[in-house]
């Protein structure tokens, strides 16, 4: 289905004039034809790979640009939003004046005027009560394809009466010449106005700005209604038992929730309301670096016609070298969720979660592969949002870089982190849910915990088998760890066993504990935060 009646005249309301043609809600075949046209140049051009998926490049931006993110500070947002210039914690919510907003808006509308435009109408949020109707406007076919993959695709009847709650205008080709005099970070911008309900994009072609932009908006609207808004994946077992997996990029959200034994609800963004857990999205956005059909068969098989690859290296014969990270380590693929066989249908939602899993990839080798959290520890580790990356291996630099990202998604939070923690804990308590901290990273041997062992741990949590295990307490962090689990080498479960001596582990543990303590200081500006210090590591 192509144009279903949006006229160039109707775009004038957004400030876009002289539109040559509106390609409204194109179907996948039309998008495929448009994005692979021989006449396209530069980053607009898509290449057909051997699987049938189209590959595109996003240019110098191969990830989000958090320093170029702004929100208009006005009556709507002044007292509710978590601003970068308030309180102890640092964040990316930089305030923008109404005047600068107008200037950015006219840059984008000028860029989009006089063009042939793609307009895609979508839903963000699987629950009709709280979903947003979002309209995307772009001049680039593959960007229209990206949002069609990633958001929920309304049926024809809903499209016929579609009225957007929020509009995203993507002007990737335009940049802001006045950024210095306006006191902005660069010529590129991702700007939001919660009063006008518009997102503007300029200078960056990265698809994820549209996906995560809407996540930031949902993260503002839902908790204010008492609905948890979560950076997590989610799945459900045959008995209707729901699990959610929180974690930062690269910790295993997509991989671990895509499980042949369980139905996928979604891989990245969810809400939790009075009915249960629901997906915000209609697609998945998986990392593809070092992807193999052996380790991740479901994701590998999802890469076919209608999937969209980003920044991968395509060989002359159309095959993809997933091991090649020369453009970026953040190579990605977006695909509609139904490319995974085992999903919740027809709507990506299920009941209340009974298991909440925090994924961390601890490159320091200190934390156990799995531990059970008390209610206070749950809030503490949720607010800490710890993971650690191994630095580049050049010149022998292997010192890990710790990342503390509140709620396992600080980059996307628009309210104070404690608001998300409070809503989550309320939902967990009402559902009688348990929380587990799972380390998918390293131990003292310098080897990463294998995916096979992590899956065995997750299976033990989901089956309830882990509840019967004898436990020990890890000192300093005071974490309760099982002594044995089926399918897991017992020695692995206590990180101290992977060190030459307990003292060697303790030295590393003290250093990491200090980082936790220093990081958590920013939450002690509220009585609730101050009270949680007790649940953290103690030196």
Curated annotation (Swiss-Prot):
It catalyses: oxaloacetate + ATP = phosphoenolpyruvate + ADP + CO2. Monomer. Belongs to the phosphoenolpyruvate carboxykinase (ATP) family. Pathway: Carbohydrate biosynthesis; gluconeogenesis. Its main location: cytoplasm. This is Phosphoenolpyruvate carboxykinase (ATP). Substrate binds at residues 64, 206, 212, 332. Binds 1 Mn(2+) ion per subunit. Mn(2+) binds at residues 212, 231, 268.
